[in-house]
Amino acid sequence: MYKVIMAPTEGSDSERVAISVAVKLAQRFDADLRLVRVETTPLVIETVARPPVLMITERTLLDEHLARLHKLEALGTECRALGAIRVDTALEKGPVAPTLRDYARKFDVDLIVMSSHARGGVKRMTLGSVTDYIIRHTNIPVLVVKPPVSFIGATPWETFGEILVPLDGSVLAEQILPEVAVLASHLNLPVKLLHVLTPVTYSQKEIMQPGLPWWDTDIATANAYLDRCASYLTEEGLTVSKEVVLSDNIATAILDCSARTGAYLIAIATRGNGGMSRLLFGSVADEITRNSPTSLLVFHPKRVAVTDETPVRSEAQVPVGT
């Protein structure tokens, strides 16, 4: 259950969809919504060597601060009217990413909802300094909202359609499943589990299609693995499908599956085995976030020592992969 949802804001129009999603999620979870804006304090320059028009005065800084505060409070009022929910606003000062992280920790935030757009463009808020920092330095799920244009104004369940969960066979990758279960159950979303098989042997590289002897064992193993992962979700009453695909490009396979199935939310833990361990912060993530309208639910699980024989249990104590 999400009890406190945080939505960072900088006052731009491009974040409106993310704010709308945060409001609707707060409604569904009966959660508190915290709208947080961070302002950096510029250096006050007082010198007679410059013309007055170029001087940054304390009055100017105060006026700008009050304008940001009023805009934030107006957004809070709008969110309360839209969702009849509990909304708190906070205008913090300091470096943006660390300040957001500290705020989330201080107020026991369960979910952070962020737009994929901000000043500085898409890259800054996806793989750039702010989102990248928050994901790396917290163990809080981050929902990066990047909905298809045709779904603007839709509800989250209409926007996301289905949750796509790429899994690589590692226990750490499975730590996203409890978060998926919570979100899917409250939004009535189906879940698709995906495992991408990459070629290892020469024969596999030469002919990448199922139904051939050199793929049979790997495909059977992958399906059995996804069945084990799916069992937890189905026990929670969720509708779950699974798919094993053959590809030498993990990102392309994930994006193709998302587009083909209408799964506009990709959920993943940031650590895993092989190629998937590079999904969020490597070339795979770049391709997903820059070339796809797909939103991301990203979870950075706490670092724990594991072996293949000792499955990790998340904070929700979910025995996945046993």
Language-model region placement:
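Well-ordered alpha-helical segments embedded in enzymatic catalytic cores
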Residues: 18-21, 99, 179, 225, ...
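Class I S-adenosyl-L-methionine
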Residues: 69, 73-81, 223, 227-234
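Gly/Ser-rich helix-loop-strand patches that form or flank binding pockets
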Residues: 1-3, 24-28, 97-153, 256-319
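Extended intrinsically disordered, low-complexity coil regions enriched in Ser, Thr, Gly, Ala
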Residues: 13, 82, 105, 135, ...
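A short acidic, glycine-rich active-site loop
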Residues: 55-70, 211-224
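Small/aliphatic-rich secondary-structure junction motif
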Residues: 1-55, 88, 158-211, 230-243, ...
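Short phosphate-binding/catalytic loops that engage adenosine nucleotides
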Residues: 84-85, 140, 237-238
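Charged docking surfaces used in two-component/phosphorelay signaling
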Residues: 91-99, 245-253
